[in-house]
């Protein structure tokens, strides 16, 4: 099932599930879908560079998120450089854009990683992680809480300093009304499984868009969607879409059983 405008493919699911690979390939080959390949760091899947390169060769996505390490600026930058060299050696750099997700334990570290990403001409897209941004920008961090507040603070800071210079993709979401705030043309796109997760708990955004049920890290592999009212999923996606000034919306509905 596909409810978004393009496909956000998770590399660990590509490796694990043949039916997932079939669905993603059909969206690419039959429908010409724009595909972002995620490295699955947020899912703690520990996908290696070798695996990510192999998936790139099989899928040939439009863009791939370079391997990042949660909250670690130095390792994330080092991984991105190493990944770029590997992409060059595999002759993939001229076919697949590289997407960089800044990391850092502090706001200062995160900003250093972000500005480093701006300075690399081979980095085409930058991600605002639902995990990394709240961790760096808020005084206290709680999993999947205050995502909107943290990203608004980050956005305001960057906008005021003319640092929104490359397309931004918001990785995941909290309160879906977050996206109505963005008016800068570099705010490109978002993805989230939350409209599906919320519907599975009978949460309709039109009634309650503030409560954020934390997403289990293995949610996409293990949750049984057979009893979920898909009209509620569609209503939540519509609510989210109506908040978006950004160009593209991804809903990880491709992970619902086919």
Where are these regions (language model features)?
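Eukaryote-skewed repeat-based solenoidal scaffolds used as protein-protein interaction platforms
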Residues: 56-190, 195
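Non-catalytic, usually N-terminal nucleic-acid engagement modules in DNA/RNA processing proteins
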Residues: 1-92, 253-258
């Amino acid at each position: 099932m596909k409810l978004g405008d393009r496909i956000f493919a998770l590399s660990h699911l590509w490796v694990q599930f043949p039916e997932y690979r079939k669905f993603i390939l059909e969206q690419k080959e039959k429908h010409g879908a724009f595909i972002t390949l995620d490295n699955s760091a947020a899912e703690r899947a520990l996908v290696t560079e070798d695996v990510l390169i192999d998936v790139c060769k099989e899928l040939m996505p439009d863009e791939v998120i370079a391997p990042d390490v949660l909250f670690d600026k130095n390792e994330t930058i080092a991984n991105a450089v190493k990944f770029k060299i590997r992409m060059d050696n595999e002759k993939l750099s001229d076919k697949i854009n590289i997407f960089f997700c800044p990391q850092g334990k502090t706001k200062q570290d995160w900003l250093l990683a972000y500005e480093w990403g701006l300075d690399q001409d081979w980095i085409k897209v930058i991600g605002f992680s639902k995990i990394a941004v709240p961790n760096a920008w808020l005084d206290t961090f709680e999993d999947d809480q205050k995502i909107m507040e943290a990203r608004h603070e980050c956005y305001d800071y960057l906008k005021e300093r003319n640092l929104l210079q490359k397309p931004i993709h918001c990785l995941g979401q909290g309160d879906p009304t977050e996206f109505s705030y963005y008016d800068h043309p570099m705010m490109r796109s978002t993805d989230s499984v939350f409209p599906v997760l919320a519907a599975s708990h009978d949460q309709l955004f039109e009634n309650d868009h503030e409560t954020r049920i934390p997403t289990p890290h293995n949610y996409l592999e293990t949750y049984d969607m057979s009893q979920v009212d898909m009209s509620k999923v569609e209503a939540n996606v519509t609510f989210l879409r109506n908040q978006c000034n950004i160009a593209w919306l991804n809903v990880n509905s491709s992970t619902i059983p086919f």
